[in-house]
Amino acid sequence: MTYDAAPDPSARQGRKTVNESQDTPLSEGSWQPFLTVNACGRDWTLERAADMEALWESMTEFTEDERLPYWTELWPSSLVLADWLYQRRESLRGQPCLDLGCGIGLTALVAQWLGANVIGMDYEPEALRFARRNAEHNAVPQPLWTVMDWRKPAVKRRSLRFIWGGDIMYEQRFAAPVLDFLEYALAEGGAAWVAEPSRAVYDTFRSMLVNRRWAGRCVWEKNIEA
């Protein structure tokens, strides 16, 4: 399901959110170093690290941020979001955009292929190493890949016309920092899209949107078979 969230006319900026119903990695089953998925009328080849469970088991310690390797999987939300970006391709062309938590890079690459000027950001440097490779595998011009913590924005205030993220929140404590980032980075009249699988944390996020005078609506819904 895709939500469109825009501010109250007397408030600040606009945004959109995407929501769908699956929550299983598209690579469920025997692990392969390359995935091929079809989105936006073409195939995409995506290289990734070991499967999430193997990476998880190899981790020897957790920090306060519990940096679990979600980035190495391709989640159904990313395909829903990719299709939504394709529907918005005329609006995206030539615009400064940011993929919030880009992982191995699918939606950043889709938007770059569609003509947007994309920043792909992730908290994990290893994710961006694979995202960069995936641009090469798919003959897409490299987005600007950057390691960034959404709690510490490294972009100019109100500089981005569109911001999106695919299933980026796993705990309620993520909701406020994500919304803070959107309020900081999104340009006047801009929009943000969040694809999500109806996880409870997004109820918290939507409540925060309302409390901060952001209006939202579902604009796209799609079932994805893992």
Regions found by a protein language model. Name each.
Residues 2-226:
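S-adenosylmethionine-dependent methyltransferases
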